[in-house]
């Protein structure tokens, strides 16, 4: 009896593979990897907060937050990292607001960056689908979900009601994109804005536009918010920014990366390197002085950053960088000649939010409650 069932199952598996191709069905243990294949976010602190060392390949990432909080900066750093590894990045600029000079300052090779500024939401998502289907890009950024305006709304009159149009558009697009992204190993970053729900007396009144589909399909959701200003004397030169991992399917969520975003320069990568190195005693801090291997490298954080940033101290910078990554258990940085487009599949490291001591089931995450546009 048992042998007959096994023979029937084997025959069914062979037929499925013949009809739909090898790999269309498999036993779970055949595809288990101990490490998720990732691409660095461009921020060490964010790599650590994500738990796996970067953005998981083949997945959807949502980055949301208030205006001018650093959402585009986070996405551009990812594009720069992909290009450093020899990959290709594409940017769907639905807001028509991408600053090429700023992108270049963050390390993006603007000559190689694929850019599209679509007229309608449908056009932007069709372009995104074609790019991902090609299997030739490694990162797709859509900026932003709120700016993906349906064609019917653009062609209609001011004041016309278009309930659920954008939610329906996003739901349909994500159903198509999710499988293709997984197959090609492409990372898709959706930048999103926030809105306020009218009439909410208790809980968080904030929500994100575009319906609920993106929240479900996202493997990682990042909330980006400014927390303080950074001043040089009386001049404001940047913002201290908190990036909270509000959803994570590949590692425990709810971790926070606190970074400095400097105007015109992006995330202060050397600054966060020093902070992490001090936490692990790789760099010693005594009073205002910072020292590495017994040698003083600067009085005050700004001077220590300048010391590490100087070309003559590149060796020390690289040593500290490697030590920090090893200490935090996120492995070695991949060689620049490795193709990030290699489609190495991995199994989700399932995480239960109830295992996290900071988890609060009553907390209101932006977008948890339905609005008129959230019917899909």
Curated annotation (Swiss-Prot):
Question: Mind telling me which Pfam families this protein's record contains?
Answer: RecA, RecA_C
Name the PROSITE patterns for this protein.
Answer: RECA_1, RECA_2, RECA_3
Q: What is its main location?
A: cytoplasm
- Acidic residues compositional bias, start-end: 366-376
Give the UniProt subcellular location, in the record's own words. Cytoplasm
Q: Name one GO biological process term.
A: DNA repair
| A GO molecular function held by the record | ATP binding
Q: Cite the NCBIfam families for this sequence.
A: tigrfam_recA
Q: Report the protein's function.
A: Can catalyze the hydrolysis of ATP in the presence of single-stranded DNA, the ATP-dependent uptake of single-stranded DNA by duplex DNA, and the ATP-dependent hybridization of homologous single-stranded DNAs. It interacts with LexA causing its activation and leading to its autocatalytic cleavage.
Which protein family is it in?
Belongs to the RecA family.
Return the protein name: Protein RecA
The taxonomy runs: Bacteria, Bacillati, Bacillota, Bacilli, Lactobacillales
